[in-house]
Amino acid sequence: MYAIIQTGGKQIKVEEGQTVYVEKLAAEAGETVTFDNVLFVGGENVKVGSPTVEGATVTGKVEKQGRAKKITVFKYKPKKNQHKKQGHRQPYTKVVIEKINA
């Protein structure tokens, strides 16, 4: 059984026991999180939401909070001696999917 959930402005396909990286959630390591925006549930009984499936939830356990690898943004204007170098590290939450309730 699998489901498509929406979190952090992104849609993610998840299965039970899978580890996923989502946008930062307000939860500490070891806490249980519930995703209510379930768009699709697949398997033997397929359920398609419009926009979400009624009563369907996905629960998971937060493994850790972290930050992704650093990316470098460099803006440059030729002939003007103008440049700007900037770095960014996106925060994320590592979640293990425990149960899909449909």
UniProtKB/Swiss-Prot annotation:
Keywords: Ribonucleoprotein, Ribosomal protein, RNA-binding, rRNA-binding
Complexes and interactors: Part of the 50S ribosomal subunit. Contacts protein L20.
Stored NCBIfam families: L21
Family: Belongs to the bacterial ribosomal protein bL21 family.
Species whose genome carries this gene: Bacillus licheniformis (strain ATCC 14580 / DSM 13 / JCM 2505 / CCUG 7422 / NBRC 12200 / NCIMB 9375 / NCTC 10341 / NRRL NRS-1264 / Gibson 46)
Function as written in the Swiss-Prot or TrEMBL entry: This protein binds to 23S rRNA in the presence of protein L20.
One annotated GO molecular function: rRNA binding
InterPro entries assigned to the protein according to its UniProt record, in alphabetical order: bL21-like, bL21-like_sf, Ribosomal_bL21, Ribosomal_bL21_CS
Protein name: Large ribosomal subunit protein bL21
GO cellular-component term (any): ribosome
Biological process according to GO: translation
